[in-house]
Amino acid sequence: MVTILDRTSSDEKRIRHPEKAHRPDTEVMRKPEWIRVKAPTSKGYHETRELVRSHKLVTVCEEAGCPNIGECWEKKHATFMIMGEICTRACAFCNVATGKPNALDMDEPENVAKAVKQMGLSHVVITSVDRDDLADGGAEHFEKVIWAIRAASPTTTIEILTPDFLKKPGALERVVAAKPDVFNHNMETVPGNYLTVRPGARYFHSVRLLQRVKELDPTMFTKSGIMVGLGEERNEVLQLMDDLRSADVDFLTIGQYLQPTRKHHKVEAFVTPEEFKSYETVAYAKGFLMVSSSPLTRSSHHAGDDFERLRAAREKKLLAAAE
């Protein structure tokens, strides 16, 4: 049995995933060669780590145990996770801690903005834990963070990766009105897996949320991502692509699910690089402007470069339509 502890102060510890403690340990499959990464050791990685600590910020890179943290932090790229490090949901795939969240940090918007400016970021990704305890799901806080970044770094493009704002009327509208450049909301997996993988969410609510973004602002880029290796069938992935295209989603990411601990959902399969390439080909054929599909693809991986490619793809499409 594996117990994961978080240190919340110099002498206090808490169990990171208390809701998973009763679960039997699951089998951990050996990773194939194509999924392995080196431990981060670079100077740039440590500088980014110190900057994050100095501004008292949380990153999804650390909290979710992202395998790309060494590469991204070496380049001084980071995805900031706002509204704390404790989530009100308990998804079976996720390494973020579950529990009763703390009060919002009112200094966080300014602290994030200062870090963005200090790092000289041309593109930043802001995500959050789920905050079902808040009346607006944290929409106002997202808004304040976006505004603070705009004030501190006017040329920085902003990508947000949001929760689903389930049963939070008006929350989505407020976030879209703050005008992020990219609105990302991950589907995470195919609908048949939701009860076991993402039990607190609703598949078609998430599809509708992405569709609603385009209704509110047709010019805003929309993005979504899924993990594979959770027992899904290929035809289910293709149907999910169709559902996202029906919502006019621009950008799709597909990556390999990696099991954080033995208490999390097990990896049912390691999808080969060839199969990822096949998914990419099909997704482009279905009309996505941008597709990133590989074992180590994550929502925020290469986000800045991908945004430039996404913008260029839209311009190319508009020019072709005008001819």
From Swiss-Prot:
Lyase recorded as keyword: no
Region (Disordered): 1-27
Residues annotated as domain Radical SAM core: 73-289
Reactions it catalyzes: [[Fe-S] cluster scaffold protein carrying a second [4Fe-4S](2+) cluster] + N(6)-octanoyl-L-lysyl-[protein] + 2 oxidized [2Fe-2S]-[ferredoxin] + 2 S-adenosyl-L-methionine + 4 H(+) = [[Fe-S] cluster scaffold protein] + N(6)-[(R)-dihydrolipoyl]-L-lysyl-[protein] + 4 Fe(3+) + 2 hydrogen sulfide + 2 5'-deoxyadenosine + 2 L-methionine + 2 reduced [2Fe-2S]-[ferredoxin]
GO cellular component term of the entry, any: cytoplasm
Record-level Gene Ontology MF annotations: 4 iron, 4 sulfur cluster binding; lipoate synthase activity; metal ion binding
Enzyme nomenclature, EC number: 2.8.1.8
Binding site for [4Fe-4S] cluster 2: 87, 91, 94
Cofactor: [4Fe-4S] cluster
SMART domains: Elp3
Residues the record lists as binding [4Fe-4S] cluster 1: 61, 66, 72, 300
PANTHER family: LIPOYL SYNTHASE, LIPOYL SYNTHASE, MITOCHONDRIAL
Identification of the protein by name: Lipoyl synthase
Species of the source: Agrobacterium fabrum (strain C58 / ATCC 33970)
